[in-house]
Design a protein with these regions (language model features):
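Phosphate-binding site of ATP-dependent enzymes
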Residues: 65-152
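Short, solvent-exposed loop/turn elements at beta->coil junctions and helix N-caps
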Residues: 38, 94-97, 163-165
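Short glycine-enriched loops at secondary-structure junctions
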Residues: 7-10, 113, 119, 165-170
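Conserved metal-phosphate-binding beta-hairpin within the catalytic cores
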Residues: 152-174
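Active-site nucleotide/adenylate-binding loops and adjacent lid/helix of ATP-dependent enzymes
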Residues: 8-91, 101, 142
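Generic beta-strand structural signal
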Residues: 33, 108-109, 166
Length: 174
């Protein structure tokens, strides 16, 4: 184990990570949590589409699903209601970011960004290497370094992979 227990706990849970990033004024996609299917549907009715639904705990892009319309959302929510996992009852929704077909993975040690790569996907909105996205070296800009240092401090430091997206209007978001 490299990172402290609390850092591993926070970074392994999107809900906890999102709350700490928001608390520390770090730009992120708009994020909505619901703890029941009815509350998730209410959020979707208020916010609209497209959104992305993600598992609170998970990696490699598994079960990350774009919700482009009400029919898709209803089907996914219904499926999650009948599964046995209690974490499936936490509906973690994020706005769909208008971005190039890539994201940026920055590796930090403490508050220092040490390396970065673009993760490019030509056929999916998911940019996970495990799902076939192609890595490409990315030069670390001052903006990236500053944002990653703030994100690292917000979650307690350690050795982290900070994922950045290039929002066409807002700039970099975590």
């Amino acid at each position: 184990v490299i990172n402290k227990f609390n850092v591993s706990t926070i970074c392994g849970n999107k809900l906890l990570t999102s709350m700490l990033l928001k608390k520390n004024n770090i730009p992120t996609p708009k994020t909505y949590f619901s703890f029941s299917a009815d509350a998730a549907r209410e959020n979707l009715d208020k916010v609209g589409y497209p959104l992305v639904i993600k598992p609170v705990i998970g990696s490699w892009g598994r079960n990350v699903i774009p919700l482009k319309d009400k029919d898709t959302a209803d089907a996914i929510i219904e499926q999650r209601e009948i599964t046995d996992g209690p974490l499936d009852r936490i509906f973690y929704l994020q706005e769909m970011i208008d971005r190039p077909p890539r994201d940026i993975r920055v590796i930090t040690i403490g508050d220092k960004a040490v390396t970065a790569m673009y993760r490019k996907s030509s056929d999916s909105f998911k940019t996970n290497i495990a799902l076939g996205a192609e890595p490409e070296i990315c030069d670390i800009t001052n903006e990236m370094e500053d944002l990653c240092a703030k994100a690292s401090k917000a979650v307690g430091g350690g050795i982290l992979g900070v994922d950045l997206m290039e929002d066409k209007e807002k700039g970099l978001v975590v």
